[in-house]
């Protein structure tokens, strides 16, 4: 069974090419695969398939709204094995992998997800240097879910609930310094209102917008702290702009894994950043079977 390993600003993934969607991605095998001691280690798993194959295999009962049967489909699983609607960094790595593996010849195409279609653009992709790419993903229009609060690292933050295809609570703290953000225990479990977010929520803590940029850390549901979160950076950008009384704009979001650029318009949003493919290899069939239970 072939695999690839890649990351987008150190948000890392195991990619499983499965064009017929035949693999049984049980929570047990996904969590084992993502375990950094007993598996390959990753923040999540990306099954590389098509929407038609996923539908035929019963991955979903009907095509997600706006996704065509002929579209590529990113079947994304969190590190705990749960299914996620969307992953911005994952889409960038997914699109990069398709080009690098010669599964796709275009630099502009659509990747389907549970959250709907995500148009992608690879900028100046060079087949002679396949391991690196710069990718923009159109993330769609965000929806505001109202204000809320969460306790992160023993400190309560107030934030803005934002739907980016998955739920976020982006907390801008105008008094937070870079040093305080770096010292915050984001890895510890976060406390939030389950009535507001019954399916869980990704929580971002960020500094105020200064010189066209913010700094952010994130606790992802089903994963814990990650070095980056693509949908989280979009949510952070929306919250930072709202803090300034703006609804549209472009800014850089600094995360522990690097820097991405987010643009928010009246009708949609865009995420641009790097992708890197680290390795390809073969999973032992015996290992896979032993972790299906």
Curated annotation (Swiss-Prot):
GO terms for cellular component: cytosol. It catalyses: (2S,6S)-2,6-diaminopimelate = meso-2,6-diaminopimelate. Pfam families: DAP_epimerase. Substrate binds at residues 11, 78, 88-89, 166, 202, 220-221, 230-231. PANTHER family: DIAMINOPIMELATE EPIMERASE, DIAMINOPIMELATE EPIMERASE, CHLOROPLASTIC. Belongs to the diaminopimelate epimerase family. Its EC number is 5.1.1.7. HAMAP family: DAP_epimerase. It is an enzyme of class 5 (isomerase). NCBIfam families: DapF (TIGR00652). Pathway: Amino-acid biosynthesis; L-lysine biosynthesis via DAP pathway; DL-2,6-diaminopimelate from LL-2,6-diaminopimelate: step 1/1. Its main location: cytoplasm. The keyword Zinc does not apply. Keywords: Amino-acid biosynthesis, Cytoplasm, Isomerase, Lysine biosynthesis. Homodimer. GO terms for molecular function: diaminopimelate epimerase activity. It comes from Mycobacterium sp. (strain KMS). Coiled coil: none annotated. Catalyzes the stereoinversion of LL-2,6-diaminopimelate (L,L-DAP) to meso-diaminopimelate (meso-DAP), a precursor of L-lysine and an essential component of the bacterial peptidoglycan. GO terms for biological process: lysine biosynthetic process via diaminopimelate. It is found in: Cytoplasm. The record marks 168, 220 as: Could be important to modulate the pK values of the two catalytic cysteine residues. The active site is at residues 87, 229. InterPro entries: DAP_epimerase_AS, DAP_epimerase_DapF. The keyword Amino-acid biosynthesis applies. PROSITE patterns: DAP_EPIMERASE. This is Diaminopimelate epimerase.
């Amino acid at each position: 069974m072939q695999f690839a390993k890649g990351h987008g600003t150190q948000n890392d993934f195991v990619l499983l090419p499965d064009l017929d969607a035949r693999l049984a991605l049980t929570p047990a095998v996904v969590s084992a695969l993502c375990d950094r001691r007993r598996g390959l280690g990753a923040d999540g798993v990306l099954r590389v398939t098509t929407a038609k194959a996923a539908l035929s295999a019963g991955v979903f009962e009907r095509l997600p709204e706006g996704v065509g049967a002929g579209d590529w489909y990113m079947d994304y699983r969190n590190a705990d094995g749960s299914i996620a609607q969307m992953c911005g960094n994952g889409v960038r790595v997914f699109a990069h992998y398709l080009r690098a593996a010669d599964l796709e010849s275009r630099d502009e195409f659509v990747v389907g997800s549970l959250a709907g279609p995500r148009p992608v653009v690879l900028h100046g992709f060079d087949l002679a240097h396949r391991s690196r790419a710069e990718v923009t993903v159109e993330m769609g229009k965000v929806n505001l879910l109202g204000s809320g609060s969460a306790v992160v690292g023993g400190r309560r933050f107030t934030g803005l609930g934002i739907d980016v295809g998955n739920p976020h609570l982006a907390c801008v703290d105008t008094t937070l310094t870079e040093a305080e953000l770096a010292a915050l225990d984001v890895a510890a479990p976060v406390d939030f209102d389950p009535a507001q977010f019954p399916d869980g929520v990704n929580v971002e803590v960020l500094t105020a917008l200064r010189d066209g940029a913010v700094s952010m850390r994130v606790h992802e549901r089903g994963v814990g702290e990650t070095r980056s979160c693509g949908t989280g950076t979009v949510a952070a950008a929306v919250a930072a702009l709202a803090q300034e009384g703006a609804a549209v704009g472009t800014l850089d979001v600094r995360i522990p894994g690097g820097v991405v650029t987010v643009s928010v318009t009246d009708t949609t949003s865009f995420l641009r950043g790097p992708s890197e493919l680290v390795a390809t290899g073969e999973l032992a069939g015996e290992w896979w079977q032993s972790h299906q239970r």
